[in-house]
Design a protein with these regions (language model features):
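A short beta-strand-to-alpha-helix junction
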Residues: 56, 99-109, 126-131, 154-165, ...
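Loop/turn elements at helix/coil->beta-strand transitions in domains of secreted/extracellular proteins
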Residues: 56-61, 117-123, 172-179, 220-224, ...
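Long, internal low-complexity/basic segments
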Residues: 28-58, 65, 70, 87, ...
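Active-site segment of extracytoplasmic enzymes that catalyze sulfate/phosphate-ester chemistry
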Residues: 35-37, 70-166, 170-180, 189-199, ...
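Formylglycine-dependent
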Residues: 35, 152-157, 161-169, 173-177, ...
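C-terminal cap/loop subdomain of S1 sulfatases and analogous C-terminal strand-loop tails that border
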Residues: 200-211, 215-218, 223, 348-358, ...
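Metal-dependent active-site segment of extracytoplasmic phospho-/sulfohydrolases and closely related
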Residues: 275, 281, 317-354
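Gram-negative bacterial Sec-dependent N-terminal signal peptides
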Residues: 1-26
Length: 560
């Protein structure tokens, strides 16, 4: 595996740090960073402990899955149109009948479906980016990633700027026990290759990946961390799991280990007599997902494709993990006072089974509906009227909503894009939370039909059916930018690579009926929203994105 097994150039000192558990380094660096944070961070500077009591305050769980499509959670019956999906191209190893695919999706999430039925489904909910790093950064900050120069995973690879406040810090400063479990993907990282005899053709197995000290979760609002710092990790035997700053061994299947950790967080908060704020970021169903899930999950599925069965088994492992967490909350007396906010970090990739993103156009890494319109809900037993909420909302609203529920004020100088949804959900406010949502992102075909040949050959390589690692012509860095703006009626999409502008009704999930020519005034107004957004955002952090960003600005200038 020439590209995947290429060793990182790292210093001997980094290797020694890793081997020794990084203890001495971490202790010194942590003290230094914490001191700086208390002096510079808005969340710290505005906090006075005597102003707030945690008594009776709700527990918070922000729950994410990785690359789960809108159609892979039976979230919206409108996204399960067999006629729309039956002719969809898919990667060979995932080919199954559409009826079996829908059945598998329905069987994989009984617990999540129950929570949705008891809570509020955000049927017009979007994440702030089509790929993981920027999307997760937006959840943490309540701000569009462009505000701090992040337009792609490449921009995020040196860590989310330390000038940005992560909203969990506000919970921590107000007496909450805060924990992050699972995927982090918000740090500047280093990779240390594992011994060659331990390496495989799954690149997740081949490096120990760890965060630079400044970007450690414990320096961004969390009392406790257990998980991985990279974009993904192996489902078994991960070499990159950390508990706080110490590398720890993998124990069985990754979903089960993360669930065990989450239950530990719930129990510690109970012992400490503190409310908790848990960010629980499962790895599933992120690819590569070839290693078989445990039999207790596998036996639920019989689609005719072992690969598809395993995919949905990984989804089911998360669902059953959530079930275990709910049971522990009930046992501890925490169940009735816990809020759960759920989303996928972005849409599904073409390297997965139907229903993928359902009837929607697009995939991960794009701002078509399939890339950013994700299954999203809020559950707070007895506190919210169950049903669908169809106004435009964003995952950037998650932490502002949770902070509002906890009666924690947000410093005004944070300038958030996210808002608390509670006034609308509790019928205290009319109208809609957002007039518009805007995206400026890299636009790649990495995860759509155009790249099926790469994914077919990738599976052959991983399974030792070929010794040639396939060339990927559609990476993020090789792709141009696009912009998208949505209001509560329309979606306006422009892509630089084909100079295409489209205006579509939000109800046109396939974006087949381009209304731009017939609605020039709507187009003009929505382009004005994008210009204002750019003017209040930062240029890309990475050099590779500078020209692409300028191309977007040029296109908007020429459209005046």
């Amino acid at each position: 595996m020439k590209s995947a097994l290429k060793k990182s150039v790292v210093s001997t000192s980094i290797s020694l740090i890793l081997a020794s558990g990084m203890a001495a380094f971490a202790a010194h660096a942590a003290d230094d960073v914490k001191l700086k944070a208390t002096k510079t961070n808005v969340a710290f500077s505005d906090f006075t402990p005597t102003e707030y009591s945690t008594k009776g305050k709700p527990n918070i769980i922000v729950l994410t899955m990785d690359d789960l499509g809108y159609g892979q959670l039976p979230f919206d019956k409108g996204s399960f149109d067999p006629k729309t999906m039956e002719n969809r191209e898919v990667v060979d190893t995932y080919k199954i009948g559409i009826d079996k695919a829908i059945e598998a999706a329905q069987k994989s999430t009984p617990t999540l479906l129950s929570l949705m039925d008891e809570g509020v489904r955000f049927t017009n909910g979007y994440v702030a980016h089509g790929v993981s790093g920027p999307s997760r950064a937006a959840i943490m900050t309540g701000r569009a990633p462009a505000r701090f120069g992040v337009y792609s995973n490449t921009d995020a690879q040196d860590g989310i700027p330390l000038t940005e406040t992560f909203l969990p810090e506000l919970f921590q400063n107000h007496g909450y026990y805060t924990a992050a479990v699972g995927k982090w993907h918000l740090s500047k990282i280093s990779n240390v290759p594992v011994p060659e005899d331990k390496q495989t053709r799954d690149y997740h197995d081949n490096f120990t990946t760890f965060s630079a000290e400044e970007w450690q979760p414990q320096n961004r609002g969390f009392d406790y961390f257990m998980g991985f710092h990279a974009a993904g990790t192996a489902y078994y035997n991960s070499p990159s799991l950390f508990q706080n700053r110490e590398r720890v061994p993998a124990k069985g299947y990754i979903s089960d280990q993360l669930t065990d950790e989450a239950i530990g967080v719930v129990d510690r908060a109970k012992t400490l007599d503190q409310p908790f704020m848990l960010y629980l970021a499962y790895n599933a169903p992120h690819l590569p997902n070839d290693n078989p899930a445990p039999e207790q999950y596998q036996k639920q599925f019989n689609t005719g494709s072992q690969t598809a069965d395993n995919y949905y088994a990984s989804v089911y492992s998360v669902d059953q993990g959530v079930k275990r967490i709910l049971e522990q909350l009930k046992k501890n007396g925490q169940y009735d006072n816990t809020i759960i906010l759920f989303t996928s970090d972005n849409g599904a990739v073409i390297d997965g089974p139907l229903p993928l993103n359902g009837a929607q156009k697009g995939y991960k890494s794009q701002t078509y509906p399939g890339g950013t319109h994700t299954p999203m809900f809020m559950w707070w037993k007895g506190k919210l009227q169950p049903g669908n909420y169809d106004k435009l909302i964003s995952a950037m609203d998650f932490y502002p909503t949770a902070l509002d529920a906890a009666d924690i004020s947000i410093p005004k100088d944070l300038k958030l894009d996210g808002v608390s949804l509670l006034p609308w959900l509790q019928d205290k406010k009319q109208g809609e939370p957002h007039k518009n949502l805007t995206w400026i992102t890299s636009y790649s075909h990495w995860f759509d039909e155009e790249n099926i040949p790469f994914w077919d050959n990738y599976h052959k390589f991983v399974r030792h059916q070929s010794d040639d690692y396939p060339h990927n012509p559609n990476t993020e860095d090789l792709s141009q930018f696009s912009y998208t703006v949505r209001n509560n009626d329309y979606s306006l999409v422009y892509t630089v690579d084909n100079n295409q502008l489209g205006l579509y009704k939000l109800t046109d999930l396939q974006q087949k009926d381009n209304l731009a020519a017939a609605n020039p005034q709507v187009v003009k107004e929505m382009q004005g929203v994008v210009r204002e957004f750019i003017d209040s955002s930062q240029p890309p952090l990475s050099e590779v994105n500078q020209e692409k960003f300028n191309n977007i600005k040029k296109a908007l200038s020429e459209a005046k």
